[in-house]
Amino acid sequence: IKLEKIDPYSNELFILKNNKTNKRKNNVSNIRDGISEVFLNSAEILFNEGLDRQALIYAQISSYLAPNSDSSYYLLGRIFKSINNNERALEYFKKVNEYSLVTHDANIAYAETIYDLKGLNSSTQFLNNIKNSFPDNINYLRTMAELFYKADNFKKSIEYYDLIFKKIEKIEFKHWPLFYSSGIALERGKNWERAEKQFLTALQFVPNNPQVLNYLGYSWIDKGININEALEMIVNAAEQRPDDGYIIDSLGWAYYQIGKYEDAVINLEKAVELVSDSVIIDHLGDALFFSGRKIEAVFQWKRALEFNASDELKNILNNKINGDSLPKPGVNAVSKPI
């Protein structure tokens, strides 16, 4: 889960607080620096548009014109990470000055890249060393929480989220992503009661956020509770993001759970077109099965095996394919397989 960063204070305030001079701040003092800044801004725009290769060219020109530019180093690192060249990405993240305006972002990006290259222990060891130097910056704690979540260590992830909340003196609007992401960790860690409270708190700040509406609505549907409200929430999310395959999957699965299997098939077929995901394809197979289209259902279950299904899901799929078990009907459905 990657959400907007929460800064207890900006890097500029950190520099002032520690009485440090940012010797590498991008000061436009001559024509060469000015041209470098133009190329850097253009590179940032291209990168945000997903044009990585073009962005790389512009960022390299910017760095050539203004050597030792931390902003250029940081952007080059992000670009190389985006094109899966993690080794080069690390080289650039490491070049960022200790008291630069992008220091914290570069440190976090470095930790995330180390995770991809060497795993959890290396990344958390790096972060432990860094966060002790910046005890007031909760973004380091949040990154720890996210990395443990990514490693399926939900208990440890929750511990870091709890530590973050203890450090926040006053809850504000900007903290809503923390309630959302910690809610997901709690839900995955089988602590639904606390998770639900986190989602509901997030909704108090962002009542129409499609991510929160979808996750909470899907969870309610899956548990067979608050069905009508959950369906309204997912419909709201789907209207906002009609091209989000995961949200459309939630809508299809909601119809499945209330026994509207034909409506489920329509939406799940659309979801599969938008994103190839083993869980979504499995959902489609189940909906087809209860719509009386059993041959098509088996085809979809077999297809789901081709899309990086977890070991648990593989067992479920194989049992359904071999006829050793049947899919479960919707939790609030009264219809039976046709």
Each predicted region: which residue ranges?
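Canonical tetratricopeptide repeat
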Residues: E12, L16, N41, L75, ...
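Structural marker of alpha-solenoid helical repeat scaffolds
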Residues: L3-I6, L65, E98-S100, N132-F134, ...
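Register position in tetratricopeptide repeats
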Residues: N48, S82, D116-L117, K150, ...
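Residue-level recognition of tetratricopeptide repeat
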Residues: E44, R78, E112, E146, ...
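TPR alpha-solenoid repeat register
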Residues: Y9-L13, S72, A106, Y140, ...
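TPR-adjacent "capping" and linker segments in tetratricopeptide-repeat scaffold/adaptor proteins
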Residues: K23-V38, E169-W176
